[in-house]
Amino acid sequence: MWPEGKMPIGLNKNQTAGEETESPNGIVKGVSVPGFEVFLPTNGAKRSMAVLICPGGAYGCLDYDREGRRTARFLQKCGVAAFVMKYRLRQYPPKARLADVQRSLSFIRSNAKKWNVSPDHIGVMGYSAGGHLAMCTVAVDGKRVYEPIDEIDNQSAKPSFAAFVYGAYFTNKGNISPSVKAAFNTDIRMFMLTGLADLYRFSTVGFFDGCTKMEKCPKVEAHFYPEGCHGFSVSTKPHNDVYRWERLLLTWLRRIASEDSSVDAEECEYLSMIPEGQDE
């Protein structure tokens, strides 16, 4: 993703990168070479929307399989191109991981023709800490946190839309975190959800409450479930309401696509359904 020797924003003082590892259950640690894994739809659509997925893990690790690959495979089956991020973690300053996301958005746009995705329909999605990272990406509104390094950075780093699943760190002691406050003024479409049994519920609820108090409310769709603890992801429990949130997400994506004449409605028809008994 970054040209050799040109990756911006180095390690924090007295930190070492270590070696990247992935456990048998898909927990990734020690990311020092950021990048993303590509999951392209196979349904023959001329173009598709694209979602850059930021797994959570409290910035100490990445729940890469459950909140990354599993979500990507689900979107892929439904005709949406998905890209799972490996971003730099707490050994690096916060701007490092934000730079990784911005670079990824520009990289995907620069390869939109190759991957058959619409450059105007490339969004970001995050779980937990990854949701905070996605929200920070919205807040900076495409303004890069690093100096452009090549022609890839001529492409926009602004997400077309953003989704946050049980996002964390939007608030701090009851106040909106400075890192996301500017997102109240965005024109980016947003989708958020959380379970009200989640210890981090105040993050999503607090941000949504702030949106409702704005003179010009952002375009945000929010869903709150009376059940659901932190970390439910795309689940194998299809009969529990909180585990069917992905239907709502796909309906929202389809609505965005249908409002833009540059994407044919026929090409987005697959976004209207998820197979019954979906288990990934």
What are these regions (language model features)?
Residues 47-56:
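Short beta-strand element of the alpha/beta-hydrolase
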Residues 63-65, 85-119, 237-242:
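Catalytic nucleophile-loop/oxyanion-hole region of alpha/beta-hydrolase
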Residues 64-83:
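Short amphipathic alpha-helix adjacent to the substrate-entry channel of hydrolases
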Residues 99, 103-185:
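Primarily recognizes the serine-hydrolase "nucleophile elbow" in alpha/beta-hydrolase
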Residues 191-194:
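Short beta-strand/loop motif that positions the catalytic acidic residue
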Residues 199-206:
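Conserved alpha/beta-hydrolase "acid-adjacent" motif
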Residues 208, 214-280:
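C-terminal catalytic histidine-bearing segment of alpha/beta-hydrolase fold enzymes
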